């Protein structure tokens, strides 16, 4: 990618769903990481969103949700391979909420899940953070999602900032 001109055109409003033919997230994400790593000697920060996962949850569309998750899984796989090769790249995977109250029903089998949605809005389900690479250990345990900011600053070796996370008094 270095030294070359390129353009990546996407939807003007919402990106289309995988079921509508959108298959560029894995390749576009890897292209962005490769481009930024070639251009930026001091490192880079890249945010990639699988936004249609949320919309499939709102629609309670299990087929679309599974397809979107598979697409995002391929995106993550590409970026983990990129990070493994470089050795200096931290990959974080998380979300800001769960949508739909998704549950796996009794009687599900490998390759044949029975899924149920409990609502069509956001839930208060705890959201995991998966980390791979240098300083990944900073992201273990249970913490407020707003603490991600401070953990990322620490991982990058930046000066600590005062946390404004609400902590109820005991």
Task: State what each model feature region is.
Residues 1-170:
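Feature captures the catalytic ectodomains and active-site-proximal regions of enzymes
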